């Protein structure tokens, strides 16, 4: 029987697994999809929030500020790109200014450092392309950006390197109490764990109900985004928010750690927890709001649009508790969940200790993971040294993002291992550029088929029935 079964391999479940992998316990991470980071972690704003928005005294406030403090060192350990670019929450009138003053007071009470409300003249010194109607802003210099799915993959991979196990394609259908723990079912299969930690995102209320916990509910909030080409990368350097509302932090314009510009998200409460469609109304709202807060947004440079679903709990705060013996909820982790994720892992460990669980630290625990994009960051001499030993790094597969065969092969062989085209994309950025895989997809299919030992026709874009090949042309002629 496994010591800890964690349900949900998003960034929260990943960091809980990583935190527990430090100790002499067995950890099994379950994921219903065919890869990690497939829910909210895959599609969000990628912001490390400073911590001014969450109400004082809430878990959101506590874990936001702690997570923000931890994030830079965590990313350094995991080899994940991190950039402290600061953020601006912009206002357009006196009412907005009053709101920003409230956020300043709240953020200061939460322990956020360096917050200031600044006027238009000072805003323009920071961002020359700020919108013409912007009059005031809250400047948060500790705000930062990361790549959320890269962070999740690194956390899960580091946990696996330290002994944790991952099982994808395991959709939990039933949980039953047994002597000494729980039996967790997926159809006719099951695993057993002494304790279960529920990190199932929008599905966490349904998982909790399987053990009789109906103390909370979760609904999905749809957020749509547009991504601009790297050519637009110098549009802004800070993350530019609007004043937040009860629905979220509003439409933002932000650089990404990979050099693109991200616009969005919208905020729409929906019943269908699987609806990740984009809508004309949503994309129109992004266009209208983004061009109001930042001028020069070139909508002709949009290379893709997408939607993410946020997990909104009924309590208004993060739900991290244990209402049933041996079963822990980590639910309702909406924004600032990405920022808070390393701190949530730490918090769950402290919670377990308070529950009397003995955790003995491993002598050989290693928090360090080699950067996923280390080859890109080498200078020309460093790259040539790698190519001498491994010539596949000289063969460019994705021309838009300059991703080599060597990088793709390394990604396929590194925990957690991808099994489809989009999995390779998230790990290497191959097919993530201007042509969106128009050139490199056949080569990625070939490499995946060879490494996984399966026919081309079995390779999918994102799992399930998303096959990209139906046969070999020359054989069918």
Language model features with spans:
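N-terminal Rossmann-like FAD-binding beta1-loop-alpha1 element of flavoenzymes
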Residues: 2-29
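Helical element adjacent to the flavin cofactor pocket in flavoenzyme catalytic cores
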Residues: 138-195
């Amino acid at each position: 029987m496994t010591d800890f079964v964690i349900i949900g391999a998003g960034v929260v479940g990943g960091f809980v697994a990583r935190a527990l992998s430090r100790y002499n316990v067995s950890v099994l991470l379950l994921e219903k999809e065919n890869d990690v980071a497939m829910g909210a972690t895959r599609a969000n704003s990628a912001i490390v929030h400073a911590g001014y928005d969450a109400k004082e005294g809430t878990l959101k406030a506590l874990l936001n500020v702690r997570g923000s403090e931890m994030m830079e060192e965590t990313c350094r350990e995991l080899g994940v790109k991190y950039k402290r670019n600061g953020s601006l929450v912009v206002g357009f009138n006196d009412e907005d200014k009053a709101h920003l003053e409230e956020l300043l007071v709240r953020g200061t009470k939460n322990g956020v450092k360096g917050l200031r409300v600044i006027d238009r003249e000072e805003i323009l010194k920071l961002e020359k392309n700020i919108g013409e109607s912007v009059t005031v802003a809250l400047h948060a210099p500790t705000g930062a950006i990361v790549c959320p799915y890269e962070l999740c993959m690194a956390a899960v991979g580091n946990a696996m390197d330290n002994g944790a196990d991952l099982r994808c394609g395991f959709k939990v259908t039933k949980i039953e109490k047994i002597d000494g723990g729980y039996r967790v079912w997926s159809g006719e299969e099951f695993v057993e764990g002494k304790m279960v930690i529920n990190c199932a995102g929008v599905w966490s209320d349904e998982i909790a109900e399987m053990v009789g916990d109906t103390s909370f509910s979760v609904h999905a909030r749809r957020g749509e985004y547009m991504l601009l080409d790297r050519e637009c990368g110098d549009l802004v350097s800070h993350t530019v928010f609007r004043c937040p509302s009860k629905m979220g932090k509003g439409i933002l314009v932000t650089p990404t750690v990979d050099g693109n510009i991200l616009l969005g998200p919208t905020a729409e409460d929906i019943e269908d927890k699987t609806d990740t469609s984009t809508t004309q109304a949503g994309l129109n709202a992004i266009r209208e709001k983004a061009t109001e807060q930042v001028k020069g947004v070139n909508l002709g440079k949009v290379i893709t649009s997408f939607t993410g679903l946020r997990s909104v709990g009924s309590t208004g705060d993060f739900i991290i508790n244990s209402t049933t013996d041996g079963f822990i909820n980590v639910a309702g982790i909406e924004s600032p969940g990405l920022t808070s994720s390393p701190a949530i892992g730490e918090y769950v460990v402290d919670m377990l200790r308070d529950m009397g669980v003995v955790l003995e630290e491993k002598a050989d625990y290693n928090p360090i993971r080699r950067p996923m994009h280390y080859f890109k960051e080498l200078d020309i001499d460093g790259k040539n040294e790698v190519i001498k030993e491994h010539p596949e790094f000289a063969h460019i597969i994705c021309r838009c993002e300059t991703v080599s065969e060597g990088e793709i092969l390394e990604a396929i062989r590194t925990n957690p291992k991808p099994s489809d085209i989009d999995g390779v994309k998230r790990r290497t950025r191959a097919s993530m550029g201007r042509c969106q895989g128009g050139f490199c997809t056949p080569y990625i299919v070939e490499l995946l088929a060879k490494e996984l030992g399966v026919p081309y026709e079995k390779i999918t874009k994102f799992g399930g029935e998303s096959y990209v090949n139906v046969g070999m042309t020359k054989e069918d002629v």
